[in-house]
Regions:
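Nucleotide-sugar donor phosphate/pyrophosphate-binding loop at the beta->alpha transition
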Residues: 69-77, 109-112, 119-140, 146-147, ...
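An amphipathic, basic-hydrophobic alpha-helix
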Residues: 64-90, 100, 104, 128-132, ...
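N-terminal strand-loop element at the rim of the active site
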Residues: 6-14, 18-20, 26-66, 154-156, ...
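Short His-centered aromatic/hydrophobic patch
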Residues: 93-99, 117
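Nucleotide-sugar donor-binding and catalytic loop/hinge architecture
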Residues: 1-3, 173-187, 210-213
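Short, structured helix-loop element that forms part of the nucleotide-activated donor/catalytic region
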Residues: 45-47, 212, 219-233
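Carbohydrate-associated surface elements
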Residues: 150, 169
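A conserved mid-protein helix/loop that constitutes part of the nucleotide-sugar donor-binding site
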Residues: 17-22, 185, 194-211, 231
Length: 233
């Protein structure tokens, strides 16, 4: 295998985006040809090694006035066109909607598509639309990556048997960081303010801890996803 393609919506800072940027940069340094296909360009994106190519496969300005179904089909077509032109040895897709798009685009191309489930399937892969798309598209996956046994167990046996559990990669720059001479009494959570990370539950739980340990402080770091979570907090 010499050429690896990653597909996700953008490289705007988030968990899946961080993993893709780290993997892409590392594979490039190892001598692989790496290309990342994204739907759009976000603000405050992760940096890529100069050896990593990025290709836009999202909608054009002319597509904005199309119907929802037409936009969905265009996204699949643009990605399929990218795959046939680039001819990667494998496509690795991250995040829920992207998985379906990549699998649909890859049908008949002969290019293996590996999908990566990054979130708790309960609440994210159990909606009516998922129950229709998963049986149609997931059998086409060349493999699946999960982060936990629980996530793996959610899916059908055929997918479990064709999967691996791989933890998030750790950037070497964070290894061996010296511990502070004096620890502060802070509980820190880092991540986007978004519904599935459930920061409201964290706050409710911390309030109970704070009753017994009033000298502790909770600090939450992360950008606003604009889904209403910030307002709830």
């Amino acid at each position: 295998m010499q050429k690896i393609a990653f597909h996700l919506n953008s490289l705007q800072q988030g968990g899946a985006e961080r993993v893709v940027s780290n993997l892409a940069n590392r594979f490039a340094k190892e001598g692989y040809e790496v290309v990342i296909a994204t739907e759009w360009y976000g603000t405050d994106e992760f940096a890529l090694d100069q050896k990593v190519r990025r290709v836009h496969v999202g909608l054009t300005k002319e597509d904005e006035n199309r119907s929802r179904i037409s936009k969905m089909l265009r996204r699949i077509w643009y990605l399929r066109r990218f795959m046939k032109k680039e001819k990667p040895d494998v496509v690795v897709a991250f995040t829920r909607g992207v998985l379906y798009r990549a699998l649909a685009a890859g049908i008949g191309t002969g290019i293996p598509v590996v999908i990566s489930v990054r979130t708790d399937p309960v609440g994210h892969y159990d909606k009516k639309a998922d129950k229709l798309r998963i049986p149609l598209l997931f059998p086409h996956a060349a493999g699946c990556v999960f982060q936990t046994e629980g996530a793996k167990a959610f899916f059908a046996p055929y997918l479990q048997e064709n999967s691996r559990i791989i933890l998030n990669p750790l950037n070497p720059k964070y290894v061996g960081v010296p511990e502070p001479a004096v620890r502060t009494k802070n509980v820190v959570q880092s991540g986007r303010l978004v519904d599935f990370k459930n920061q409201p539950m964290l706050i409710r739980a911390f309030l109970k801890v704070h009753e017994k340990h009033p000298d502790y402080t909770l600090k939450i770091y992360g950008p606003d996803s604009k889904d209403g979570t910030k307002e709830i907090l």
